[in-house]
Amino acid sequence: NIITLDIGGTSADVSLIANGEPSTVHARHLAGFPLRLPALDVNAVGAGGGSIAWIDKDALLKVGPESAGAIPGPACYDKGGSEATVTDANVILGRLPSEALLDGRMPINMELARTSIAHLAKKLKMSTENTAIGIVQVASAVIVKAIRAISVERGYDPSEFTLFAYGGAGPLHAMEVAKELGIKKVFIPPNPGILCAEGLLSSDLICLLYTSDAADDVIS
């Protein structure tokens, strides 16, 4: 029984595996067209490392769904980005050391991260550190809500599952998410940032043939 948590730059993607069987759906839309083919049931929300923090009209701190993407990326990447992101908040809080990316070959600029969050902190009348804490908490809350949608709302108790956290930012938020959901066990694989790529290369290939019945539109 596993709940997967994949946090990349743009989104946090969660899914559920119960009794060894991954959750699937049979109705999706692609570019406005309905697809009646089985697919993994993945719930994606805008709470990735590059998700931008902002303040709404009620002066409440929000995160996502807009993202800084890979280019220019978070402010701390020093590639032209200036808006505060979840990654910048993690840098300010010391959760992402300067040598963390590409074994130190991709430097992290702490001052740019601090400057990006300071703009929000001034509007919120809070310290930069407390604003960074708020950004991380909001992002984690969005993820918790997404996991509850695929577990609690479908009759599953998250505390009976293991949280499998991966992606570049998955391990950074795994503990807060697990604590909020009552999950007792968190599994973080080696090299979590490239787990999806490794899975793509190492997974077995299978071929499934489906036909649809035009009379009742049922897949068999």
Go through the PLM ranges and name each one:
Residues 1-5, 13-19, 25-209:
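Helical "lid/coupling" subdomains associated with nucleotide-phosphate turnover
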Residues 10:
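Short acidic, Gly/Ser-rich segments with clustered Asp/Glu that frequently serve as metal-coordination loops
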Residues 210-219:
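Single conserved hydrophobic/aromatic residue that forms the stacking wall/gate
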